[in-house]
Structures are given as C-alpha cells and as structure tokens.
Amino acid sequence: MTPDRQFRSPVRHFWRWLIPALLLWAFALQGTRGLWSPDEGRYVDVALEMLKSGDWLRPHVNDEFAHVTKPPLTYWAVASSVELFGRHEWAARLPHALAFALSVLLVGAMGRRLVPERPWLPALVYATFVLPYVAAHVITTDTLLAFFTTAYAAAFVEARARRDSRGAGGYVAAGWAAAGLAFLAKGPPGLLPLAGLALFAWSERRIVGPTLYLSWSGLLLFVVLGFGWYLRVAFDQPDLVRYFLVDEFWNRLSSPQSHRNADAIGAVRVYGGTLLLGTLPWTWPLLRDLSRSLRRPSALPLAWRADPLSRLLACWILVPLVVFVLARSRLPFYLLPLFAPLALVAARAVGAWSNRRVALLALAGAIGLLALRAFGALVVRPEDDRALARAIAALPVPRIDEVAFVNTAPRYGLAFYLDAEVERLSLDDDPPAAQRPPARGEVPLREGCRILLVEARSAAALRSNLATGVGSYRRIGAAGRYTAYVVPGGGCD
C-alpha cells in the first residue's frame, strides 16, 4: 500500500472530526494572555459600559464620553459573552474564536463547490493561515467582519450553484443579511468584497442573469441590519452623519491624519508583509501560482473569459485590495476578509500535491502557530493591561474607583480587571479632544478614589497643576512606567 493511500482513510473522515478539532483549535489557550492595549482594552471597556449602563445603543468608554468610531456589533458580541460566561479573557475573546471557527466551515462549504476534488483542503488552509488564526485571538472588529464577508460570499456562491433550483432565493436573502451585518461590524469596509462579487456577477451576466442575486427580502434585511443603527443614532444626534461620512470614511480614505502607514510605501510595507507572512505556511504555493500566471500575461484574458472560478477569486481579492492600497489608513488586519478567497487559491495551487505532503505542511504550520500562542502567553508585554492592573491593585489605597491617565493614552483594559472607570485627562486648560477634560477642572471633583497615572515626561507639570489647583497631593508609588498620585479626600486616604 502506498503512503498516500494509507493517508486517504483519515481524509475520508475529515468532516467527521473537523468540528471538534476545529473547536479545540479555535478556543484553546484563549484566556492565557491578558488584554492588550489599545484595541482589546478599548473594545472590552465599551462592552462593559454597555452592561453597566444598560445602554446598548450608544457605545461609551466611560460614563461621560461616547465612543462611536466603530458600529456596535463587536461591542454587543463581547458584552453578551461576558454577561453569559463571566469576566474572563476567554469569555471576552470567545465571539472571535467562534467567528474564526465558523469562517473555516464556510470556506470548507465553498470548497465543495469550487474545489470539489478535495473540498476539505480550503478549510485546512484557512485554519492554518497565520493572519486569521492570530486575529481570532485579538479583540478587534476584523475577525467578525471577515466572518460576515465570508458568509455572504459563501451564500452567493451556493446560490449560483443552485440557480436552476428553488433553493437559490433563500441563499441570496441570507447573503444580503450577512452583508448588512458586515456593514454593522465595521461600516464601508464590510462591503468591499461585495463590490468584487458584484463585478464578477456583471462579468457573467449573459450566463447567469443578474436577477439571481437580487432579493427584495434580502435587500430589506440588508438595509435594516446594516443601516438601522446608523439611522437611529443619527436621528438622536444629527451631527454624527457628518462624523461618519467625513471623519470615519472620507478622511480615512484620503487623508494621512490617522497616522496609519499613510506614506507612499506604506501599502507595500504593511500589505506586502501581511500577505507574505499572513499566508504562511502556504505562501510559497501562492507565490508560485502567481508567478506562473504572470509569466503568461497573454493568457490572462482567455482565462478571464473561460475560467469562472479564477474570475471569481480574482474579483473577490483584487477589487478590495486596490481600495485598501489606495486608502491612506493601512493596518495588517484590514486584509483579513481577503484570506478566505486566498485559501481557495492556495487549495487550487496545491491541487497536485499528495495528501501526505499537504498534511505535513499543515502540521508544521499548526505547530508554529501554537508556539506563537505560547510565546504570547508567557512573555509579558508593555501593553498587557492585566500586568498593569496587578501593579495598580498593589498600591496603598483602600479601593480604586477611577484611574485617570494624564497627558498619555489611557489603558481602557484596566476597567476589566479593576472594575473602575478609566479616563484621560489633559494638563491643558483647553484640550483639543472632547475625551480629554482638563485635569485642573476634573481633579477637584469628588468621584471616589481616583488614581492619577502619569509618565515621567509629564510628572513635573502634573505636580505643578495639582499644587495650584487643589493645593495638595500625594505620590503613592509606581505602576509600570507610570507614577501614581492621589489627592486628599474621595476615599483614597
């Protein structure tokens, strides 16, 4: 019996053990690492504020300031999980692990249609890609966004395959509902893969009628799910319309003000590295497939016309990628929705490989990812809010009601560990940002025991501010790179 034939039996049972293995793969070690600032701490803090206030419509970072830079779906997911399973890092990250696991299953479902000879292979590739696996263990909007974009792509692929049967309409409606939820997860970026799929649908309009992808019930679900929250909060606060359209959409697209790799080579530096490292251990097959295509540019128009699968994957990947490259705000996780079609491309690229060779590469990738997870859990990084919370809890105060960061970025994840309010104060009397109230006016307010944290560069200015503003203060120690002060009264004595 050949080695490859010996390996076929486990492959035939792939779908039987996929779900338990996938759940173990996605959920294991989720709680071993503390929350990292800024993203994880902020998302969890806003979710906790929803649970505390009961206001699930308007996100807040504390009881004073709203935080509407992102739509609320991620906050809702984290808040629901923490409410159900308790205040633990595992519970906070559970929605993302679940979204990752479901994305793997959806990629596998598309594999049945697009890689029928080995439908399990795209799921295996996606599960062992570096970027989706790493992102599933970091609380941001991107893993949920990738799940919903993959969901609507899978629904439209299935509808196309069933276009001659009655079941296609249900998949189309489900696809539009998923597109609405993608928009509720992150706004306009959630529709970029949809634009690529729309280009593909237009390209085959003579073969598959464009009405296949239209559904009145689906479009209604898309509008209600995708735009309902935006319309509701804008009705109460009309100036949010300009904020959403100008600050959060147009300025991020066209302006370098977000300081996220907006320079000329930022796209190459960020996205080039993300695609090369994020697709490990399948990078080489993808590069070889790309090289083979580029060596014969004259054959590309023929392939575009003759191969619907290649056309679908090209539209799905290239249309969003062009927008991401042109936009002036660039981060690695932005490309996460493109890794589902990349998994399908990689599965085709290794189509001639033996099952044993595929399994060995996937196993090597899995071992590398587990090692990366273990490293992240064992090494305490400066942005670890759990470590900082332990240092603050050891300070000589009877209780902690609020932690205020003076002239430095707040660590909102402390709210998760200390059950205290977290805010940012400014030493300027007229600070530029609404979420930075002046320390001179805030510190005298008796809001329980407030610990003031300041870095060395601003410590002297804070002491001067306190001396003239409240007359007295007390240094109570250090926590990480911060020096801690309190003022008399408020329960800190």
Which residues does each predicted region cover?
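Extracytoplasmic/secreted cell-surface and envelope-processing proteins
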Residues: L192, A461-R463
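Short periplasmic/luminal acceptor-recognition loop of GT-C membrane glycosyltransferases, typified by
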Residues: L372-A461, R475-R481, Y485-V487
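Membrane-integral, polyisoprenol-dependent glycosyltransferases
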Residues: T2-G351, N355-R356, F375, A415, ...
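Transmembrane alpha-helical segments
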Residues: A349, R357-V380
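Extracellular secreted precursors and ectodomains with disulfide-bonded cysteine-rich loops/domains
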Residues: G490-C492
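Short secondary-structure junctions
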Residues: N465-G477
